[in-house]
């Protein structure tokens, strides 16, 4: 049964890929609108749609463009679903002003996609996706130094796997080594080298504490991180070099945060969350390789430990390789794993995810602003039914055909 539905959708996808006619190559740059007082507004983004077929049930985030790990319970029979998803679709407004303090100029960014609050059940609600804010920040920059205040990615977010289906929820995100989240805060970026062969950038960030709400704070929506009265802190050092035949980058980032596990109004100790992540990429000719590794404690709010909160320790990593057959045809392979340490993780719930592995592959066609991809994702998740119970494994598979137009 599984081979039948996989083969059917794969053949259909390859026929559609083969039928695409060539288009003139062009690089998306966004639409620039000139405003008063020397300001400009750049409108950019993309339309993204995915048609997918799943065998087995994914858990946590969802079944479509946000599928990441296998659910603990699976259908005994009739496992196949066919569905569509357009919530990756994104729009970005970037405002740029003239210098106001010496060489420092203001810039403001507002970005949104359609992974907002769920708008109801089928047959109609699931076709009415709602907007959500991704970024909302204001910069003051002279090119070398940028002060950013507002909502943006924590430095821990790092590298991002290439995909046409899993964009807002990247491959392995909160499931197989890909961590990080966006928060309101203060971010400082400074290029330590200028005009050198290797660019070195320092990033410092202090942003909103985060964590699940407990006790009376559930009603007020105050999480454990906010209740601690302390920010999350991160520092990143990035190295990169670009050349016609070889480009590479490498980074290391450290993280610390605090959570008041008893919430406001109740005396108690804070839980300290820590993490270290290293990652990078290398692009020799037509090949590309990228990935990252993290190890940490109590960073579920950053999508660590297979997105499990509390006093949990563990590590995760992912690696993706790609090859450009031609300027238009490329292939990618992905593997990621996240492995909480059961013996050192008292915060794991009775029914817990103790390991997850994601394997994915994509064949991609690009012609200017247009891209089409056929992807396969398989999640293998190890569950623990109770504390000290015998673990068991579940799996779920997704075949997806995705299209994107970038503007």
Regions found by a protein language model. Give the residues of each.
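C-terminal closing repeat unit and adjoining cap/tail of repeat-based domains
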Residues: 362-376
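Outer membrane beta-barrel
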Residues: 28-63, 69, 73-212, 229-234, ...
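Bacterial N-terminal signal peptides that target proteins for export
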Residues: 1-10
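Sequence/structural signature of outer-membrane beta-barrel proteins
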Residues: 54, 98-100, 115-121, 152-158, ...
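Detector for outer-membrane/organellar transmembrane beta-barrel domains
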Residues: 235, 239-358, 365
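Outer-membrane beta-barrel "beta-signal"
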Residues: 365-368, 393-407
């Amino acid at each position: 049964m599984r081979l039948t539905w996989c083969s059917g959708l794969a053949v259909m996808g390859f026929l559609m890929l083969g039928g695409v006619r060539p288009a003139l190559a062009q690089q998306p740059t966004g639409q620039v609108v000139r405003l008063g007082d020397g300001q400009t507004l750049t409108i950019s983004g993309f339309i993204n749609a995915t048609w997918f077929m799943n065998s087995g049930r994914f858990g946590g985030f969802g079944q479509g463009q946000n599928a990441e790990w296998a659910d603990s319970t699976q259908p005994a029979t009739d496992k196949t679903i066919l569905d569509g998803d357009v919530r990756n679709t994104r729009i970005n407004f970037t405002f740029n002003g003239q210098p106001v303090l010496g060489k420092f100029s203001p810039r403001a960014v507002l970005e949104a996609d359609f992974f907002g609050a769920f708008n109801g059940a089928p047959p109609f609600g699931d076709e009415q996706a709602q907007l959500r804010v991704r970024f909302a920040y204001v910069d003051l920059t002279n090119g070398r130094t940028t002060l950013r205040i507002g909502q943006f990615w924590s430095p821990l977010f790092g590298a991002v796997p290439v995909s046409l289906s899993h964009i807002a929820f990247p491959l392995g995100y909160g499931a197989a080594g890909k961590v990080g989240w966006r928060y309101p805060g203060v971010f400082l970026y400074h290029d330590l080298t200028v005009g050198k062969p290797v660019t070195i950038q320092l990033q410092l960030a202090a942003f909103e504490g985060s964590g699940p709400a407990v006790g009376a704070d559930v009603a007020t929506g105050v999480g454990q991180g906010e209740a601690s009265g302390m920010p999350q802190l991160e520092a990143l050092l990035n190295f990169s070099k670009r050349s016609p035949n070889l480009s590479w980058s490498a980074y290391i980032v450290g993280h610390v945060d605090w959570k008041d596990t008893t919430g406001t109004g109740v005396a108690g100790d804070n839980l300290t969350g820590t993490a270290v992540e290293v990652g990078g990429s290398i692009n020799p000719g037509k090949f590309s390789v990228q990935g990252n590794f993290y190890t940490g404690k109590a960073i579920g709010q950053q999508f660590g430990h297979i997105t499990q909160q509390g006093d949990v320790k563990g590590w995760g990593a992912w690696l993706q390789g790609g090859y450009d057959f031609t300027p238009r045809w490329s292939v990618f392979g992905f593997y990621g794993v996240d492995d909480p340490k059961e013996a050192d993780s008292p915060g794991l719930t009775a029914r817990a995810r103790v390991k997850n592995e994601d394997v994915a592959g994509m064949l991609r066609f690009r012609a200017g602003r247009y891209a089409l991809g056929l992807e396969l994702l398989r999640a293998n998740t190890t569950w623990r039914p109770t504390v000290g119970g015998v673990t068991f494994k579940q799996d779920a598979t997704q075949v997806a055909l995705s299209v994107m137009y970038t503007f």
